[in-house]
Amino acid sequence: MFFKRLYDLRIDNDLTQQQIADYLTCNRQVYARYERGIREIPVSMLIKLADLYNTSVDYIVGRTNNVK
């Protein structure tokens, strides 16, 4: 499940859920639901996260194991 990668990327970059939520302009609880897989994350937010983490949307959603 790709939400595990959201968590791992956030932790690897020493960021909090609040920092990511602020970056995405959503509230922390909404982002936490994305990260736990409770709520589906919009494609526009996946793109922003891929840009933030300097990776691809394909990596985040599990279509590749190549981080870059």
Give, region by region, the residue ranges found by the protein language model.
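Conserved hydrophobic/aromatic packing and binding residues within compact polymer-binding modules
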Residues: 6, 20-21, 31-34, 60
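Recognition helix of helix-turn-helix/homeodomain-like DNA-binding domains
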Residues: 25-40
